[in-house]
A protein has these predicted regions:
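Short, hydrophobic/amphipathic alpha-helical patches that form generic packing surfaces
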Residues: 71-83
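Conserved short "hinge" loops at termini or chain/domain junctions
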Residues: 1-62, 92, 96, 103-118
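Charged, low-complexity interaction regions
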Residues: 84-90
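Structural motif
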Residues: 62-72
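Mid-sequence acidic-hydrophobic segments that form the walls
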Residues: 80-84, 101-108
Length: 118
């Protein structure tokens, strides 16, 4: 999925049009891209140790597992976009959803406890 599609899904979740409180599309798009990169970095390092590359263009694909891209990232982007728009009710609502969904990434990882042999 591309960055633009994640941003579009977040905007749809919020019920915004792209001009809400900004006066220009480019200002809103920059805020959206910043929000996306913040969330992308957050979930990237939950799944990987290194290799993060920031998204510089909304047409770029987001290389994360499908469940992260479709089910987690739009809620985080929505939370950060709401915050940038001064929409505290939506920011709180989507932050809670995002954090609950983000916890599932850690649950899916398996940790193996081994006692060393001597």
């Amino acid at each position: 999925m591309t960055a633009a599609k994640i941003i579009d899904k977040a905007i749809l979740l919020l019920g915004y049009d792209t001009l809400k409180n900004t006066g220009s599309i480019s200002g809103f798009e920059q805020s959206a891209l910043t929000a996306l990169n913040t969330v992308y970095a957050d979930v990237f390092y939950l799944c990987n140790k290194e290799g993060f590359q920031e998204i510089t263009d909304a047409s770029q694909p987001v290389n994360m597992p499908e469940n992260v891209v479709f089910d987690i990232m739009p809620y985080g982007v929505a939370a950060f976009l709401a915050s940038s728009q001064g929409d505290s009710d939506n920011q709180l609502f989507f932050s809670r959803i995002y954090n609950l969904k983000r916890k599932n990434i850690l649950k899916e990882m398996t940790f193996e406890d081994k006692i060393p042999t001597v």
